[in-house]
Design a protein with these regions (language model features):
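Long, contiguous binding/interaction regions
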Residues: 1-26, 30-31, 45-52, 59, ...
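Short amphipathic alpha-helical segments
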Residues: 36-38
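Short hydrophobic/aromatic beta-strand micro-patches
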Residues: 41-43
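Active-site beta-strand termini and strand-to-loop segments that position acidic
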Residues: 82-84
């Protein structure tokens, strides 16, 4: 069974959430670029957390047959970029995210709901 790019993006967002990343956003960039189908953007409070997210996603993708095509910034872990072809994950330290403003640069991208709304009691 093949995994769609959207399913990969949702898996990445869920991985970020499980590792306690903040402000997770999934952007559908298919109509505005050919470099990838989806960008996933999240914030972390420290470098260890950023590396843990990247490591966990690499393992999960490998389990479903997706190979990491490239990774940048893992040493410093202030902005980690993980490229899986169909999706690109941007893991930002909180202090870097506002400065680089990926969501602003890709403002024409459609945001994808990735999390089920909480049930109200």
């Amino acid at each position: 069974m093949s995994t769609t790019p959207r399913q990969l993006a949702l898996l990445a967002a869920e991985t970020c959430d499980e590792k306690k990343a903040k402000d997770i956003v999934v952007l559908d960039v298919r109509k505005i670029t050919t470099i990838s189908d989806y960008f996933i953007v999240c914030s972390t409070s420290n470098e260890r957390q950023a590396r843990a997210i990247a490591d966990d996603l690499r393992v999960r993708m490998k389990e479903i047959g997706k190979r990491e095509m490239g990774v940048e910034g893992i040493e410093d872990a202030r902005w980690v970029l993980q490229d899986f072809g169909d999706i690109v994950l941007h893991i930002f330290h909180e202090s870097q995210r506002e400065f680089y403003d990926i969501e602003g640069l890709w403002a024409d991208a459609k945001q994808v709901r990735w999390k089920k709304p909480s049930k109200k009691s």
